[in-house]
Amino acid sequence: MASGFLKGTLILTIAGFVVKAIGSINWILLSRILGGEGIGIYQMAFPIYLLLLQISSAGVPIAISILTAERLALHDFGGAKRVFNISFTMLTITGFIASLAMYFGADWLISSGLIAESRAYYSIIALAPAVFFVTWISCFRGYIQGYEMMTPTAISQIVEQLLRVIVMLGAAAILLPYGLPAAAGGASLGAGVGAFGAFLVLLYYYYKLPKASSTGESYNGPRESAKEILSRLLTLSIPISLASIMLPLTANLDLLIVPRRLLDAGFPMNEVTELFGYLTGMAVPLINLATIITAALATSIVPAISHAFAKRDHQGIYDRTAGSMRLTFMATVPFTVLLYVLAAPTVTLIYNAPKAELATQITAFSIFFLGVHQVTTGILQGLNRPRIPVINMGISLIIKVILNWTLTAIPWLGIGGAAWATVADIGFAALLNLIYIKKYTGYFLDISLLWKNVVSAGVMGILIFLSYHYLTDILPMWANFILTGIEGLLLYVIIMVLLKGLNKNDGASMPLIGRFFR
Protein backbone atom coordinates (compact mmCIF):
# COMPACT_ATOMS: atom_id res chain seq x y z
CA MET A 1 0.00 0.00 0.00
CA ALA A 2 1.23 3.46 -0.81
CA SER A 3 2.36 5.10 2.41
CA GLY A 4 1.64 8.60 1.08
CA PHE A 5 -2.13 8.38 1.00
CA LEU A 6 -2.09 6.15 4.09
CA LYS A 7 -0.40 8.95 6.01
CA GLY A 8 -2.90 11.45 4.64
CA THR A 9 -5.77 9.17 5.62
CA LEU A 10 -4.48 8.82 9.18
CA ILE A 11 -4.04 12.58 9.55
CA LEU A 12 -7.53 13.36 8.23
CA THR A 13 -9.06 10.60 10.36
CA ILE A 14 -7.54 11.98 13.56
CA ALA A 15 -8.72 15.47 12.62
CA GLY A 16 -12.19 14.10 11.88
CA PHE A 17 -12.49 12.51 15.32
CA VAL A 18 -11.18 15.66 17.04
CA VAL A 19 -13.61 17.89 15.14
CA LYS A 20 -16.56 15.61 15.95
CA ALA A 21 -15.57 15.44 19.63
CA ILE A 22 -15.34 19.23 19.88
CA GLY A 23 -18.63 19.56 18.01
CA SER A 24 -20.40 17.14 20.35
CA ILE A 25 -19.23 19.00 23.46
CA ASN A 26 -20.19 22.30 21.85
CA TRP A 27 -23.70 21.08 21.04
CA ILE A 28 -24.28 20.04 24.64
CA LEU A 29 -23.07 23.40 26.00
CA LEU A 30 -24.89 25.48 23.38
CA SER A 31 -28.12 23.61 24.12
CA ARG A 32 -27.74 24.50 27.79
CA ILE A 33 -27.24 28.19 26.93
CA LEU A 34 -29.97 28.59 24.30
CA GLY A 35 -32.43 25.88 25.29
CA GLY A 36 -34.68 24.10 22.83
CA GLU A 37 -36.33 27.28 21.51
CA GLY A 38 -33.02 29.07 20.99
CA ILE A 39 -31.53 26.07 19.20
CA GLY A 40 -34.57 26.04 16.94
CA ILE A 41 -34.01 29.70 16.01
CA TYR A 42 -30.30 29.02 15.43
CA GLN A 43 -31.04 26.03 13.17
CA MET A 44 -33.56 27.93 11.02
CA ALA A 45 -30.82 29.74 9.09
CA PHE A 46 -28.70 26.70 8.24
CA PRO A 47 -30.62 25.22 5.27
CA ILE A 48 -30.19 28.50 3.35
CA TYR A 49 -26.53 28.72 4.42
CA LEU A 50 -25.80 25.18 3.22
CA LEU A 51 -27.67 25.77 -0.04
CA LEU A 52 -25.59 28.88 -0.81
CA LEU A 53 -22.39 26.96 -0.04
CA GLN A 54 -23.49 24.27 -2.49
CA ILE A 55 -24.08 26.90 -5.17
CA SER A 56 -20.89 28.88 -4.55
CA SER A 57 -18.23 26.22 -3.95
CA ALA A 58 -19.43 22.60 -3.65
CA GLY A 59 -17.30 20.14 -5.62
CA VAL A 60 -14.59 22.71 -6.32
CA PRO A 61 -11.97 21.52 -3.76
CA ILE A 62 -11.85 18.01 -5.24
CA ALA A 63 -11.77 19.42 -8.78
CA ILE A 64 -8.88 21.72 -7.87
CA SER A 65 -6.97 18.87 -6.21
CA ILE A 66 -7.40 16.73 -9.35
CA LEU A 67 -6.19 19.45 -11.74
CA THR A 68 -3.31 20.40 -9.43
CA ALA A 69 -2.15 16.79 -8.98
CA GLU A 70 -2.22 16.24 -12.75
CA ARG A 71 0.05 19.21 -13.38
CA LEU A 72 2.43 18.39 -10.55
CA ALA A 73 2.80 14.86 -11.93
CA LEU A 74 4.17 16.47 -15.11
CA HIS A 75 6.30 18.95 -13.08
CA ASP A 76 4.14 21.79 -14.43
CA PHE A 77 4.30 23.95 -11.30
CA GLY A 78 3.33 27.03 -13.27
CA GLY A 79 0.24 25.25 -14.58
CA ALA A 80 -0.72 24.20 -11.05
CA LYS A 81 -0.42 27.81 -9.90
CA ARG A 82 -2.60 28.94 -12.81
CA VAL A 83 -5.27 26.45 -11.73
CA PHE A 84 -5.19 27.97 -8.26
CA ASN A 85 -5.30 31.58 -9.48
CA ILE A 86 -8.23 30.98 -11.83
CA SER A 87 -10.11 28.96 -9.20
CA PHE A 88 -9.48 31.57 -6.54
CA THR A 89 -10.79 34.34 -8.78
CA MET A 90 -13.92 32.37 -9.66
CA LEU A 91 -14.63 31.42 -6.04
CA THR A 92 -14.02 34.95 -4.78
CA ILE A 93 -16.71 36.20 -7.17
CA THR A 94 -19.24 33.44 -6.44
CA GLY A 95 -18.58 33.55 -2.69
CA PHE A 96 -18.94 37.33 -2.57
CA ILE A 97 -22.23 37.25 -4.50
CA ALA A 98 -23.62 34.42 -2.34
CA SER A 99 -22.56 36.20 0.85
CA LEU A 100 -24.23 39.46 -0.22
CA ALA A 101 -27.35 37.56 -1.27
CA MET A 102 -27.64 35.99 2.16
CA TYR A 103 -27.05 39.26 4.02
CA PHE A 104 -29.34 41.51 2.00
CA GLY A 105 -31.89 38.77 1.30
CA ALA A 106 -32.54 37.99 4.97
CA ASP A 107 -35.64 40.20 5.14
CA TRP A 108 -37.06 38.70 1.95
CA LEU A 109 -36.44 35.11 3.12
CA ILE A 110 -38.56 35.82 6.19
CA SER A 111 -41.27 37.96 4.58
CA SER A 112 -41.74 35.47 1.73
CA GLY A 113 -42.24 32.63 4.20
CA LEU A 114 -39.24 30.58 3.07
CA ILE A 115 -38.04 30.89 6.66
CA ALA A 116 -41.10 30.83 8.89
CA GLU A 117 -39.37 32.05 12.05
CA SER A 118 -38.92 35.86 11.92
CA ARG A 119 -36.59 35.71 14.92
CA ALA A 120 -33.98 33.92 12.75
CA TYR A 121 -33.04 37.24 11.07
CA TYR A 122 -29.86 37.78 13.10
CA SER A 123 -28.78 34.18 12.55
CA ILE A 124 -29.11 34.61 8.78
CA ILE A 125 -27.08 37.81 8.50
CA ALA A 126 -24.47 36.49 10.96
CA LEU A 127 -23.83 33.49 8.71
CA ALA A 128 -23.35 35.62 5.57
CA PRO A 129 -19.58 36.26 6.07
CA ALA A 130 -19.01 32.53 6.57
CA VAL A 131 -20.22 31.83 3.03
CA PHE A 132 -17.45 34.04 1.64
CA PHE A 133 -14.64 32.63 3.77
CA VAL A 134 -15.69 29.01 3.29
CA THR A 135 -15.41 29.44 -0.50
CA TRP A 136 -11.89 30.76 0.01
CA ILE A 137 -10.77 27.89 2.22
CA SER A 138 -12.28 25.36 -0.19
CA CYS A 139 -9.94 26.71 -2.87
CA PHE A 140 -6.85 26.57 -0.65
CA ARG A 141 -7.69 23.09 0.66
CA GLY A 142 -8.16 21.71 -2.83
CA TYR A 143 -4.90 23.22 -4.09
CA ILE A 144 -2.80 22.01 -1.15
CA GLN A 145 -4.39 18.55 -1.28
CA GLY A 146 -3.27 18.41 -4.91
CA TYR A 147 0.28 18.31 -3.50
CA GLU A 148 -0.88 15.22 -1.54
CA MET A 149 -0.43 17.21 1.69
CA MET A 150 -3.27 16.49 4.12
CA THR A 151 -1.79 18.00 7.30
CA PRO A 152 -2.78 21.60 6.40
CA THR A 153 -6.38 20.53 5.80
CA ALA A 154 -6.46 18.61 9.09
CA ILE A 155 -5.01 21.47 11.15
CA SER A 156 -7.29 24.01 9.47
CA GLN A 157 -10.33 21.85 10.26
CA ILE A 158 -9.39 21.66 13.95
CA VAL A 159 -8.62 25.40 14.16
CA GLU A 160 -11.89 26.19 12.37
CA GLN A 161 -13.89 24.08 14.80
CA LEU A 162 -12.12 25.42 17.91
CA LEU A 163 -12.60 29.08 16.94
CA ARG A 164 -16.16 28.40 15.87
CA VAL A 165 -17.01 26.83 19.21
CA ILE A 166 -15.26 29.50 21.32
CA VAL A 167 -17.00 32.36 19.50
CA MET A 168 -20.31 30.51 19.32
CA LEU A 169 -20.51 29.78 23.04
CA GLY A 170 -19.04 33.13 24.10
CA ALA A 171 -21.26 35.26 21.87
CA ALA A 172 -24.37 33.26 22.76
CA ALA A 173 -23.71 33.66 26.49
CA ILE A 174 -22.90 37.38 26.22
CA LEU A 175 -25.94 38.19 24.06
CA LEU A 176 -28.44 35.97 25.89
CA PRO A 177 -29.64 38.87 28.16
CA TYR A 178 -30.69 40.69 24.96
CA GLY A 179 -33.03 37.86 23.97
CA LEU A 180 -32.92 34.50 22.20
CA PRO A 181 -32.79 35.99 18.64
CA ALA A 182 -29.66 37.98 19.53
CA ALA A 183 -28.06 35.00 21.28
CA ALA A 184 -28.79 32.71 18.32
CA GLY A 185 -27.33 35.34 15.98
CA GLY A 186 -24.22 35.55 18.16
CA ALA A 187 -23.83 31.78 18.01
CA SER A 188 -24.02 31.95 14.21
CA LEU A 189 -21.06 34.36 14.13
CA GLY A 190 -18.82 31.44 15.10
CA ALA A 191 -19.02 29.94 11.61
CA GLY A 192 -17.45 33.00 9.96
CA VAL A 193 -14.73 33.44 12.59
CA GLY A 194 -13.84 29.74 12.39
CA ALA A 195 -13.65 29.86 8.59
CA PHE A 196 -11.42 32.94 8.70
CA GLY A 197 -9.10 31.19 11.17
CA ALA A 198 -8.89 28.17 8.87
CA PHE A 199 -8.09 30.51 5.97
CA LEU A 200 -5.12 31.97 7.87
CA VAL A 201 -3.78 28.47 8.60
CA LEU A 202 -4.08 27.47 4.95
CA LEU A 203 -2.51 30.75 3.83
CA TYR A 204 0.53 29.95 5.99
CA TYR A 205 0.93 26.51 4.39
CA TYR A 206 0.29 27.94 0.93
CA TYR A 207 3.39 30.11 1.20
CA LYS A 208 5.41 27.07 2.33
CA LEU A 209 4.59 25.04 -0.78
CA PRO A 210 7.57 24.15 -3.02
CA LYS A 211 8.17 26.55 -5.88
CA ALA A 212 9.17 25.53 -9.38
CA SER A 213 12.59 27.16 -8.98
CA SER A 214 13.38 25.05 -5.91
CA THR A 215 12.56 21.67 -7.47
CA GLY A 216 15.07 21.67 -10.29
CA GLU A 217 12.34 20.44 -12.62
CA SER A 218 10.97 22.24 -15.66
CA TYR A 219 7.97 21.74 -17.91
CA ASN A 220 8.11 22.41 -21.64
CA GLY A 221 4.75 21.01 -22.72
CA PRO A 222 1.62 22.84 -23.92
CA ARG A 223 -0.11 25.25 -21.55
CA GLU A 224 -3.88 25.49 -21.21
CA SER A 225 -5.64 28.81 -21.53
CA ALA A 226 -7.68 30.28 -18.69
CA LYS A 227 -10.84 29.33 -20.58
CA GLU A 228 -9.72 25.71 -20.90
CA ILE A 229 -8.83 25.48 -17.20
CA LEU A 230 -12.15 27.02 -16.18
CA SER A 231 -14.00 24.63 -18.48
CA ARG A 232 -12.28 21.60 -16.96
CA LEU A 233 -12.84 22.94 -13.46
CA LEU A 234 -16.58 23.21 -14.08
CA THR A 235 -16.70 19.85 -15.89
CA LEU A 236 -15.24 18.17 -12.82
CA SER A 237 -16.89 20.19 -10.05
CA ILE A 238 -20.50 20.13 -11.27
CA PRO A 239 -20.87 16.30 -11.12
CA ILE A 240 -19.11 16.28 -7.74
CA SER A 241 -21.54 18.94 -6.52
CA LEU A 242 -24.47 16.90 -7.79
CA ALA A 243 -23.13 13.89 -5.86
CA SER A 244 -23.09 15.92 -2.65
CA ILE A 245 -26.65 17.11 -3.32
CA MET A 246 -27.82 13.50 -3.65
CA LEU A 247 -27.38 12.93 0.10
CA PRO A 248 -29.81 15.66 1.28
CA LEU A 249 -32.12 14.68 -1.59
CA THR A 250 -32.18 11.12 -0.26
CA ALA A 251 -32.92 12.42 3.25
CA ASN A 252 -35.83 14.52 1.96
CA LEU A 253 -37.28 11.55 0.08
CA ASP A 254 -37.04 9.50 3.28
CA LEU A 255 -38.95 12.26 5.05
CA LEU A 256 -41.69 12.16 2.42
CA ILE A 257 -42.04 8.38 2.14
CA VAL A 258 -41.07 6.61 5.38
CA PRO A 259 -43.50 8.30 7.85
CA ARG A 260 -46.39 7.98 5.40
CA ARG A 261 -45.77 4.26 4.80
CA LEU A 262 -45.39 3.61 8.53
CA LEU A 263 -48.83 5.19 8.99
CA ASP A 264 -50.16 2.95 6.20
CA ALA A 265 -48.72 -0.04 8.09
CA GLY A 266 -50.88 0.86 11.08
CA PHE A 267 -48.41 2.62 13.36
CA PRO A 268 -49.83 5.62 15.31
CA MET A 269 -48.38 9.05 14.51
CA ASN A 270 -46.46 9.41 17.76
CA GLU A 271 -44.77 6.04 17.20
CA VAL A 272 -44.05 6.91 13.55
CA THR A 273 -42.17 10.03 14.65
CA GLU A 274 -40.27 8.02 17.24
CA LEU A 275 -39.30 5.25 14.81
CA PHE A 276 -38.23 7.74 12.14
CA GLY A 277 -36.00 9.43 14.72
CA TYR A 278 -34.39 6.10 15.59
CA LEU A 279 -33.34 5.59 11.97
CA THR A 280 -32.42 9.05 10.71
CA GLY A 281 -31.41 10.75 13.95
CA MET A 282 -29.63 7.90 15.73
CA ALA A 283 -28.64 4.98 13.46
CA VAL A 284 -27.48 6.98 10.43
CA PRO A 285 -25.18 9.34 12.43
CA LEU A 286 -23.50 6.24 13.93
CA ILE A 287 -22.84 4.94 10.42
CA ASN A 288 -21.29 8.27 9.43
CA LEU A 289 -19.10 8.17 12.54
CA ALA A 290 -17.97 4.61 11.78
CA THR A 291 -16.87 5.62 8.26
CA ILE A 292 -14.64 8.55 9.23
CA ILE A 293 -11.59 6.53 8.14
CA THR A 294 -12.94 5.76 4.67
CA ALA A 295 -14.17 9.35 4.25
CA ALA A 296 -10.61 10.50 4.94
CA LEU A 297 -9.23 7.84 2.59
CA ALA A 298 -11.61 9.00 -0.16
CA THR A 299 -10.17 12.52 0.14
CA SER A 300 -6.51 11.48 0.16
CA ILE A 301 -6.82 8.93 -2.67
CA VAL A 302 -8.11 11.48 -5.24
CA PRO A 303 -4.80 13.35 -5.84
CA ALA A 304 -2.83 10.09 -5.56
CA ILE A 305 -4.87 8.53 -8.38
CA SER A 306 -4.84 11.78 -10.41
CA HIS A 307 -1.04 11.92 -10.14
CA ALA A 308 -0.66 8.39 -11.52
CA PHE A 309 -3.37 8.97 -14.15
CA ALA A 310 -1.63 12.07 -15.51
CA LYS A 311 1.60 10.07 -15.92
CA ARG A 312 -0.32 7.16 -17.49
CA ASP A 313 1.11 4.97 -14.77
CA HIS A 314 -1.36 2.09 -15.03
CA GLN A 315 0.48 -0.05 -12.51
CA GLY A 316 0.52 2.87 -10.09
CA ILE A 317 -3.23 3.32 -10.51
CA TYR A 318 -3.82 -0.39 -9.89
CA ASP A 319 -1.55 -0.47 -6.83
CA ARG A 320 -3.18 2.62 -5.30
CA THR A 321 -6.64 1.21 -5.99
CA ALA A 322 -5.80 -2.19 -4.50
CA GLY A 323 -4.11 -0.57 -1.49
CA SER A 324 -7.03 1.73 -0.78
CA MET A 325 -9.54 -1.11 -1.06
CA ARG A 326 -7.42 -3.25 1.28
CA LEU A 327 -7.57 -0.49 3.88
CA THR A 328 -11.31 -0.06 3.23
CA PHE A 329 -11.98 -3.70 4.10
CA MET A 330 -10.03 -3.42 7.35
CA ALA A 331 -11.69 -0.11 8.25
CA THR A 332 -15.28 -1.26 7.66
CA VAL A 333 -15.79 -5.01 8.08
CA PRO A 334 -14.88 -5.21 11.80
CA PHE A 335 -16.84 -2.04 12.63
CA THR A 336 -19.88 -3.45 10.83
CA VAL A 337 -19.81 -6.49 13.10
CA LEU A 338 -18.99 -4.46 16.22
CA LEU A 339 -21.97 -2.14 15.76
CA TYR A 340 -24.28 -5.04 14.92
CA VAL A 341 -23.33 -7.03 18.03
CA LEU A 342 -23.11 -4.02 20.36
CA ALA A 343 -26.06 -2.08 18.96
CA ALA A 344 -28.07 -2.24 22.19
CA PRO A 345 -25.41 -0.80 24.54
CA THR A 346 -24.34 1.71 21.86
CA VAL A 347 -27.76 3.34 21.48
CA THR A 348 -28.45 3.06 25.21
CA LEU A 349 -25.22 4.73 26.29
CA ILE A 350 -25.16 7.42 23.59
CA TYR A 351 -28.86 8.20 23.14
CA ASN A 352 -30.56 6.50 26.10
CA ALA A 353 -32.83 4.94 23.47
CA PRO A 354 -32.67 1.12 23.67
CA LYS A 355 -35.58 0.87 21.20
CA ALA A 356 -33.25 2.14 18.46
CA GLU A 357 -31.43 -1.22 18.51
CA LEU A 358 -33.24 -2.79 15.53
CA ALA A 359 -32.74 0.16 13.16
CA THR A 360 -29.09 0.39 14.23
CA GLN A 361 -28.40 -3.34 13.78
CA ILE A 362 -29.79 -3.40 10.25
CA THR A 363 -28.18 -0.12 9.22
CA ALA A 364 -24.81 -1.38 10.53
CA PHE A 365 -24.45 -3.41 7.32
CA SER A 366 -24.22 -0.17 5.37
CA ILE A 367 -20.88 0.65 7.07
CA PHE A 368 -19.09 -1.71 4.70
CA PHE A 369 -21.01 -0.58 1.62
CA LEU A 370 -20.69 3.12 2.44
CA GLY A 371 -16.94 2.75 2.95
CA VAL A 372 -16.56 1.00 -0.40
CA HIS A 373 -18.76 3.62 -2.08
CA GLN A 374 -16.79 6.53 -0.62
CA VAL A 375 -13.41 5.17 -1.68
CA THR A 376 -14.48 4.00 -5.14
CA THR A 377 -16.06 7.41 -5.72
CA GLY A 378 -12.72 9.03 -4.86
CA ILE A 379 -10.90 6.68 -7.25
CA LEU A 380 -13.31 7.42 -10.11
CA GLN A 381 -12.98 11.15 -9.47
CA GLY A 382 -9.19 10.79 -9.61
CA LEU A 383 -9.60 9.01 -12.95
CA ASN A 384 -11.51 12.02 -14.32
CA ARG A 385 -14.80 10.11 -14.21
CA PRO A 386 -16.82 12.17 -11.68
CA ARG A 387 -20.11 11.66 -13.53
CA ILE A 388 -20.15 7.91 -13.01
CA PRO A 389 -20.74 7.96 -9.21
CA VAL A 390 -23.54 10.52 -9.66
CA ILE A 391 -25.34 8.33 -12.21
CA ASN A 392 -24.86 5.28 -9.99
CA MET A 393 -26.27 7.14 -6.98
CA GLY A 394 -29.26 8.20 -9.06
CA ILE A 395 -29.97 4.60 -10.09
CA SER A 396 -29.61 3.33 -6.52
CA LEU A 397 -31.86 6.13 -5.28
CA ILE A 398 -34.68 4.83 -7.49
CA ILE A 399 -34.20 1.39 -5.95
CA LYS A 400 -34.31 2.91 -2.46
CA VAL A 401 -37.57 4.74 -3.19
CA ILE A 402 -39.17 1.50 -4.40
CA LEU A 403 -37.93 -0.47 -1.38
CA ASN A 404 -38.91 2.29 1.05
CA TRP A 405 -42.42 2.31 -0.39
CA THR A 406 -42.86 -1.47 -0.30
CA LEU A 407 -40.87 -2.70 2.72
CA THR A 408 -41.73 0.06 5.21
CA ALA A 409 -45.47 -0.60 4.81
CA ILE A 410 -45.07 -4.25 5.88
CA PRO A 411 -46.20 -4.20 9.54
CA TRP A 412 -43.71 -6.77 10.85
CA LEU A 413 -40.83 -4.92 9.16
CA GLY A 414 -41.82 -1.30 9.79
CA ILE A 415 -38.77 0.92 10.30
CA GLY A 416 -36.63 -2.16 9.69
CA GLY A 417 -37.86 -2.07 6.09
CA ALA A 418 -36.64 1.52 5.71
CA ALA A 419 -33.30 0.49 7.23
CA TRP A 420 -32.94 -2.36 4.73
CA ALA A 421 -33.78 0.08 1.92
CA THR A 422 -30.89 2.28 3.11
CA VAL A 423 -28.51 -0.69 3.05
CA ALA A 424 -29.67 -1.71 -0.43
CA ASP A 425 -29.34 1.86 -1.71
CA ILE A 426 -25.71 2.33 -0.75
CA GLY A 427 -24.83 -1.30 -1.49
CA PHE A 428 -26.07 -1.11 -5.07
CA ALA A 429 -24.29 2.22 -5.65
CA ALA A 430 -21.05 0.66 -4.33
CA LEU A 431 -21.45 -2.36 -6.61
CA LEU A 432 -21.97 -0.17 -9.68
CA ASN A 433 -18.87 1.84 -8.76
CA LEU A 434 -16.85 -1.38 -8.45
CA ILE A 435 -17.93 -2.47 -11.93
CA TYR A 436 -16.52 0.76 -13.37
CA ILE A 437 -13.38 0.47 -11.23
CA LYS A 438 -12.83 -2.94 -12.85
CA LYS A 439 -13.32 -1.38 -16.28
CA TYR A 440 -10.84 1.46 -15.80
CA THR A 441 -8.20 -0.06 -13.48
CA GLY A 442 -8.49 -3.83 -13.86
CA TYR A 443 -9.20 -4.19 -10.12
CA PHE A 444 -12.48 -5.59 -8.84
CA LEU A 445 -12.35 -7.25 -5.43
CA ASP A 446 -9.68 -9.28 -3.69
CA ILE A 447 -12.07 -12.06 -2.69
CA SER A 448 -9.43 -13.90 -0.65
CA LEU A 449 -8.65 -10.80 1.44
CA LEU A 450 -12.33 -9.92 1.81
CA TRP A 451 -13.09 -13.47 2.97
CA LYS A 452 -10.30 -13.29 5.58
CA ASN A 453 -11.77 -10.02 6.85
CA VAL A 454 -15.27 -11.49 7.04
CA VAL A 455 -14.09 -14.65 8.85
CA SER A 456 -11.97 -12.63 11.30
CA ALA A 457 -14.80 -10.21 12.02
CA GLY A 458 -17.33 -13.06 12.27
CA VAL A 459 -15.27 -14.96 14.85
CA MET A 460 -14.68 -11.67 16.67
CA GLY A 461 -18.43 -11.03 16.69
CA ILE A 462 -19.25 -14.40 18.25
CA LEU A 463 -16.58 -14.01 20.94
CA ILE A 464 -17.53 -10.45 21.92
CA PHE A 465 -21.22 -11.41 22.00
CA LEU A 466 -20.41 -14.14 24.53
CA SER A 467 -18.01 -11.89 26.43
CA TYR A 468 -20.44 -8.97 26.68
CA HIS A 469 -23.28 -11.10 27.99
CA TYR A 470 -20.99 -12.92 30.43
CA LEU A 471 -19.81 -9.58 31.87
CA THR A 472 -23.27 -7.96 31.95
CA ASP A 473 -23.86 -8.82 35.62
CA ILE A 474 -20.24 -8.11 36.60
CA LEU A 475 -19.43 -4.70 35.08
CA PRO A 476 -21.49 -1.53 34.55
CA MET A 477 -22.71 -1.15 30.98
CA TRP A 478 -20.22 1.58 30.00
CA ALA A 479 -17.20 -0.40 31.28
CA ASN A 480 -18.43 -3.60 29.65
CA PHE A 481 -19.00 -1.74 26.37
CA ILE A 482 -15.51 -0.21 26.26
CA LEU A 483 -13.76 -3.41 27.35
CA THR A 484 -15.66 -5.53 24.84
CA GLY A 485 -14.98 -3.06 22.01
CA ILE A 486 -11.22 -3.05 22.67
CA GLU A 487 -11.24 -6.82 23.09
CA GLY A 488 -13.05 -7.17 19.77
CA LEU A 489 -10.58 -5.09 17.78
CA LEU A 490 -7.62 -6.96 19.30
CA LEU A 491 -9.25 -10.29 18.46
CA TYR A 492 -9.86 -9.14 14.89
CA VAL A 493 -6.20 -8.19 14.42
CA ILE A 494 -4.95 -11.46 15.94
CA ILE A 495 -7.23 -13.59 13.77
CA MET A 496 -6.27 -11.59 10.66
CA VAL A 497 -2.59 -12.25 11.40
CA LEU A 498 -3.28 -15.97 11.90
CA LEU A 499 -5.14 -16.09 8.58
CA LYS A 500 -2.29 -14.12 6.94
CA GLY A 501 -4.66 -11.30 6.11
CA LEU A 502 -2.23 -8.96 7.86
CA ASN A 503 1.53 -9.22 7.59
CA LYS A 504 4.75 -7.41 8.41
CA ASN A 505 4.58 -5.33 5.22
CA ASP A 506 1.17 -3.97 6.24
CA GLY A 507 2.61 -2.87 9.56
CA ALA A 508 5.66 -1.35 7.90
CA SER A 509 3.48 0.75 5.58
CA MET A 510 1.52 2.29 8.45
CA PRO A 511 2.36 5.90 9.37
CA LEU A 512 3.91 6.57 12.80
CA ILE A 513 4.28 2.89 13.80
CA GLY A 514 5.74 1.56 10.54
CA ARG A 515 9.37 1.81 11.65
CA PHE A 516 8.76 -0.82 14.35
CA PHE A 517 7.97 -3.42 11.68
CA ARG A 518 10.92 -2.74 9.37
Model-inferred region functions:
Residues 466-518:
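Membrane-proximal transmembrane or re-entrant/amphipathic helices at the cytosolic face
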Residues 97-116, 334-352:
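Short membrane-interface helical motifs at transmembrane helix boundaries
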Residues 115-139, 352-376:
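Alpha-helical transmembrane segments of multi-pass membrane proteins
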